[in-house]
């Protein structure tokens, strides 16, 4: 072992020694030092290369050192540039001189030119294949030594080419991006050249926003939105004025334009597509060349709009974007979260504060003098039951430059919504128990609407402001408050504030301060509100009463708290309900003037309390919504029955609230208490300018919002602005309290309904009457009403001439004008296509939705308005509602109200202004204009409804064409028509007023739905109400619901509160209803109003007005679809019986609302008929027809109108806009509501009916009775059409049936009116279709019936439709029921006196038998009504005479249930006849009418009077017979061609509505009726 170890040791040593030897040998050689240094350098360089790739931490440290060094020399600058290039993965090198540094990549290079001192000379960028171009932005950054920004530019250039494919493909993609940028730049220049817009306008409205071209590495930037808070300096809080040179890239919301690779292939243009330098339209759309293989290439890339921060958008918005671009927004399904939660995160991310805020969706805002707490209810259910969901988007794909403007508009809309919601999100921390901390709940209602609920600043109640972001610059606002709540502010005011600040906290503070100001300025308001509330409480119908049932409408009030939660339907439903109830509320507020007087007059107070019973119903419907009794109705009722009261009320003209709040239309709006009109989203502009700016321009932006916008406009303009009045009814805080009380009470509720349904469209109505009245008009209106009551003429007075109504805009005239202004109507109605005023009126009537709210209100009113019913003489319900507000005997009380109602109607309520004479004077020429300006007023005036012959009916008809259209519009708009109708009828002496009230229109609008409901419910007003909680038409509800209507109708279940005995005994001799006459007329009118509320009710009303027989018929109708029908009949009847005698008949017929459907509805009708006859030949003609057809059409009409209406609007049974839309359909489709209205101011709903009615009128007086029932609704002019319509209905053709030359003559006279009605009649736009619409109406009725079933949901959603559908709905119900109870309708005895004592069954004092079972059977034909549509058409078209002739046949047909369908058709005919009858009115309704209108009108008046007297007797007999045979089969009724058929038809409709088994009337009935109608009309003449 030892030897071995030694050996190893020796080996090691030897190795070591050999190694050392070798080392010595190697290094012993002398090497130069230079070689050693070289070796060291090599090693060092290798280390640097290795470190750059492998030691990032070391590199970052070196870069930090570089940044810390000051660049003061050329080497330092080049070193820094090379360092930046390395950071971005780019190469760099210096030029030989060392003064140029090149930063390079495969696709581009940047050349930085320096001087020897290191100072920057220039920076150029050269893209692949291009010459270098100097970049000022890069020069600026480097001169300022801003190397970070320079580095960002380099990064941007790199990302620009971060595309798939080789360099050649990348070059094509760059060319595509360049061509896109060139096109967008051209679009920006085109916009600027066309508008010379400044930076802010470019940002908010520019087709491509504010465009900043691509520069260096910054992509092309489109600045598309900036909020008011963005324009405030963060440090000084002073506003920033934008100039071309101070718009920073970071300001506001921006999107960059780029191109990115995609997995799919897209055809992208590689050359500019814009040809020329001028846009091809007013939207600055350029002319693009088509995509071809020459100018485009398929690339695996696409254009993108990219956002710096992901934007929260709703699920619906994502779908809209994808529909716009045609390209999926996300490659994979995105995750959705509550939108409000995303908006909250987005807002909080703007603050650099890293500390998370534990907000739990509750945020605090500290404002000067106020502290707010906002709870964002992110999980609130929408109508579809789901919460509002959203997601984040960071980029949007598109292929064509033409898509960019569309995309930007969508994004602006979403961002504006986000901005409002985000304005509540603040990091402010406050203690929950802080004293004076105000609580607000923000609840989503849809992707563009939300509600802010808070406690009323003065009262202990909940208030809700619904904001609808129509687009980025228009926000429409509706304030919903209790009927008796103190004024807060107007919708216009709120909208102006919102649009100015786009901040909810700032807006809430402004609202509170405004409310405090108003309270300080109007100390009497609270007293008035209390008085009204007490009165209402004393007289409120049972909660189950129709009015309450209508709480659907009331829901809005409760909905106010949380529109979404209040209504089962969902936030939107609630919203709509809210609007309805608000409108109702408005009406109640409308009593403001009265209340004000009350507060000042202890005697007045006591009187009101004594009589409050009748009036209280009006407010009740709205009240339920806000659980606030409708003070207004009681007032109306009280004043109606007390001349002293009237005088007291009218003595206060000086105190006009208009004057009080005149300066602030907004306040006036609010006053209406329905301030949160359903038009909720109508006027988006409201907020921007608090008071000065006129929102009308902005309003127009959205049709749904149109209503709202109009409201805004009127508010801005001031009480005088009709639009404002119309739209602002709900918003009109001031006026509603005062004058609008009756009007508002009665009709406004109806309007809200349409608005809620908007369909937006809303949009809009509630405001109409309330708002109008609210203005200074209130006092005038009240005084006028008193005067008018004393000298019936005053009714027409309100809207003597276009000028007058304008003058009285704030009061009723203006309101009406405004209301019926195309604008206004458009606002409410999506489709306000009526070129003809008649169409507008029809629309107004056809806006039952709008009226529906009124109806809701009326519903209540009707329920507790049996007395009113008597006063009204026609429909216990609708009329009562209306009456209560405008007509019930409280002429004084509702002086303002009546005027307002008239305004709504379009009839100048300020009869005092025009007086009968004035009305007359304006009748012809003014009529047309008036009609346009004030549907009701105009129609009334032209018809000389003042004359009272067809008075309200005739005027309605006259208005019917033009006026009706307006009325319709109005009704739609402000629900004022309904109000008006009441008012008009209430004024009674105001045929014009009646016309104005075209309660048919308004009511029709509301009523039909109600009717539908009522029909569906059959007899339970309450049910009816509840059926459409949201927008139960007051009128319709009222008619149906109240004992009178409902009672009368088979559905006693309506369980209406006992309706005081309403004995409308109007001296026959009085053509012009004096005060008493006026009362009855007003009563009639009220009925009409009610009717107007409901489509078919409207018809019924008209009928009542038309003749006693109509009234009776109405009764029958009532039995059938009594609830709604009655109202309708009554209402129209009262309108029809503008003349004293008519009024009387109306009164009589109204006398026993409860007695029988007819009694309630028909009574009025009968009286109307009689009155109408006195009117004169045309009047007579029209009236008789009217009186009979009115009722029947009224009843049948809703279905018909609905149907037809439904055509255009019908499709929208669930579509509020459509239904409510003032489309020709609406108006022409009078059958639906609109049809009738179209023909005549009030004819809208009775258009179809009118037609039938027309025939009826023409037929013998006895026939007349029936006809009146069906035609009354339409009025004389309408009647012609109606007959024709009826005929058409039975035949299924409108024009085919021209039975008599005499009828033709009548039709010719009415033609214009008819024509007007016609277009309305035709759902679409055709005037002729008016009758047609009726036909359609029938189908509609079935549809409406469905509506009835779906009513609540649909109601909201189709408030407008509802107007139509309402009409239709009633009609539908009617239709269904009509078919079932057609007989009932056909044999009805119209009792002028409806004495229904507290639940007692109505007794008929004066009976007129509606002898046309055929009429009833006509209902059975209702399905034919669709065909009948044609007859409706004639009404509308110039060929009306022919159609009208046919109409007579139809009149016979009236018995034929189609009249329900006919309802519309009849309505049209009726309207035509009405127009004819009330030439002036007709003129109103129809411009052409004016030619023959004046002389014929006078003649009509006289002849009509005679005919009326005859008819009255006849009607009484018929009524008796009818009473006997109310339930009798239609056949017996059919025996009486005119009266029976038409009346039956109408009645039948009504009856059907009442759930009476429908009897199918043979077609032949139509023929007989036509003949009879013709005879009556001729004889009457």
Swiss-Prot record:
A motif (LXXLL motif 2) lies at residues 645-649. Residues 16-590, 656-1065 are annotated as: Interaction with ESR1. One of its GO terms (molecular function) is nuclear thyroid hormone receptor binding. One of its GO terms (biological process) is cellular response to thyroid hormone stimulus. Residues 655-675, 807-819, 1162-1195, 1330-1345, 1425-1440, 1448-1482, 1533-1552 have a biased composition (Polar residues). Residues 1249-1421 are annotated as: Interaction with TP53. Residues 405-644 are annotated as: Interaction with THRA. A motif (LXXLL motif 1) lies at residues 604-608. Residues 1033-1050, 1077-1093, 1100-1111, 1119-1156, 1218-1227, 1234-1293 have a biased composition (Low complexity). A motif (Integrase domain-binding motif (IBM)) lies at residues 874-901. Residues 622-632 have a biased composition (Pro residues). It is found in: Nucleus. InterPro entries: Mediator_complex_subunit_1, Mediator_Med1. Residues 542-788 are annotated as: Interaction with VDR. The modification Phosphothreonine is found at residues 804, 1031, 1050, 1056, 1215, 1440, 1457. Transmembrane segments: none annotated. Residues 1-670 are annotated as: Interaction with the Mediator complex and THRA. The modification Phosphoserine is found at residues 588, 664, 794, 886, 952, 1156, 1207, 1223, 1302, 1347, 1403, 1433, 1463, 1465, 1479, 1481-1482. Component of the Mediator complex, a coactivator involved in the regulated transcription of nearly all RNA polymerase II-dependent genes. Mediator functions as a bridge to convey information from gene-specific regulatory proteins to the basal RNA polymerase II transcription machinery. Mediator is recruited to promoters by direct interactions with regulatory proteins and serves as a scaffold for the assembly of a functional preinitiation complex with RNA polymerase II and the general transcription factors. PANTHER family: MEDIATOR OF RNA POLYMERASE II TRANSCRIPTION SUBUNIT 1. Belongs to the Mediator complex subunit 1 family. This is Mediator of RNA polymerase II transcription subunit 1. It comes from Pongo abelii. The lineage of its organism: Eukaryota, Metazoa, Chordata, Craniata, Vertebrata. The gene is MED1.
